[in-house]
Amino acid sequence: MGEVDEAFVQALEHRPKLSVTEAEGIPLIDLSALSATNTSIKNPDSTIRDLVVEIGNACKNWGFFQVINHGVPTDKRRSIENMARKFFEQPLEEKRKVRRDEKKVVGYYDTEHTKNVRDWKEVFDFVVESPCLMPTSPDPEDKEIAETYNQWPDYPPEFREACEEYAKEVEKLAYKLMELIALSLGLPPDSFNGFFKDQTTFVRLNHYPPCPAPHLALGVGRHKDAGALTVLAQDDVGGLEVKRKSDGEWVRVKPTPDAYIINVGDIIQVWSNDAYESVEHRVMVNSEKERFSIPFFFFPSHYTMVKPLDELTNEQNPAKYRAYSWGKFLTTRKGSNFKKLEVENVQIYHFRVQELADKLDGALSINNK
């Protein structure tokens, strides 16, 4: 990655501004109430109810928030961060021994694309439940399901254990957050839990090397997360930028020591029938410092049909999306990581009911001519 190949260069309108706007107002939420012995999400007292209001406001107004006193042990986080550094320090040929491809969809990768532009990063992915069941193709008629197994490197020797122990702890946090989000929508706290049986969740270790042209390239181009929830650990270098809902400005999320950055994904947007919105974000790189981050992508089972929840729709607020297969959606997305597409990748707005109505109107007007 010494030279900036044109594959990394963003279109003019998407190139990063090197002057940084620090985000004012991204909520910082203290979860210590969850660990108090006399409180429970199942029977919320006033402190939990206050927390639920905070979470709901953050989801509605930002789609992003940070959490502290979250219950994930610091030593587990430090351990996986150290393992990531050791793994990425190795020569390329060593890392490529666990390279992922279109058949092995987890492992090491260094040529990922976001919106058809190559990202300035290298990654290592592992699934939280192994084997993980996934459709073999995005074709709706193809019912074949494959088992995905993790590929673990020989070095560092403690790598697998550190990854698995960390994932268990963050998974507990993800479930708690989903329960708080359910309450904030007026639902029972366990409303979402069933979707995550046979989950397709994965964890990614990101390494962003120093970039000689940070004004041209991005660590990750602008995108929205396709899953339900993302729980992100970032180091003190920073670089994550969020598109502020109020004015569309790109703002930098300043690292808070030991905090996690949480963002609502597309699935929550659909489940909530647009009450909460998945927000665009991107990652800046810099010319001097490398950066590491570890996102936990909380994904439901492959057989989940994602649609607005019945409890959140009625005659006055009809469903804004038709149901779609999460497994087929994810398989389509995964395939696009390996090649440039001639058309736009699948997005949730392709399933908007209004989009469907517009297409039908268009077809009718053509047929009537």
Which residues fall in each region the model found?
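Peripheral, non-catalytic segments flanking oxidoreductase cores
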Residues: 1-369
